[in-house]
């Protein structure tokens, strides 16, 4: 049963990486025909399901329109390195969206690292991720995202525009929590 008041966190994160491409208006112009899709999750069984699903689709052409089709050529699993410190420099492969939902008006606002209340909302998102995915983490949830070489951007998706954070940051917090976020994503 759908409950609009219950925000659901996903147990994975992903990024689509286009090499040598640029955005021109509403189109992505490719100068290289290769792209990478990177998945990560703290749910090993989900990763295995995804991996096996993609194996079945290897060398199958998926056509999106008359000018664009893709074909999965290579698929491999890369072990994630364990974070050994309470602070790590990270670079986002895709924009960070931190959603602040107002239940009374049922409206969303997307915060960037420059907005007041960003740190609190980011920690609320992390808390929801931990709770909704039944992750055994019993310490106080507290992370800090400090901009290093960061910027904000407007991200278009399905006719909507979102405020997002991009670039490099220092992420600090408990080591166990940082490793959970390394696998499952942030935001």
Predicted region positions:
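RNA-interacting cores
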Residues: 1-187
């Amino acid at each position: 049963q759908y409950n609009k008041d219950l925000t659901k966190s996903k147990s994975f994160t992903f990024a689509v990486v286009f090499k040598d491409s640029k955005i021109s208006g509403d189109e992505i112009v490719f100068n290289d025909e290769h792209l990478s899709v990177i998945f990560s999750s703290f749910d090993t069984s989900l990763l295995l399901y995804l991996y096996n699903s993609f194996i079945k689709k290897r060398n199958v052409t998926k056509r999106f329109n008359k000018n664009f089709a893709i074909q999965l050529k290579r698929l491999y699993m890369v072990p994630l390195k364990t974070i050994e410190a309470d602070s790590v420099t990270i670079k986002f492969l895709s924009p960070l969206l931190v959603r602040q939902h107002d239940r009374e008006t049922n409206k969303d606002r997307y915060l960037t690292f420059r907005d007041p209340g960003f740190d609190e909302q980011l920690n609320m998102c992390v808390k929801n991720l931990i709770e909704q995915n039944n992750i055994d983490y019993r310490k106080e949830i507290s992370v800090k995202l400090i901009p290093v070489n960061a910027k904000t951007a407007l991200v278009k998706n399905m006719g909507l525009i979102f405020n997002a954070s991009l670039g490099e940051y220092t992420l600090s917090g408990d080591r166990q929590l940082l490793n959970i976020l390394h696998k499952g994503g942030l935001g």
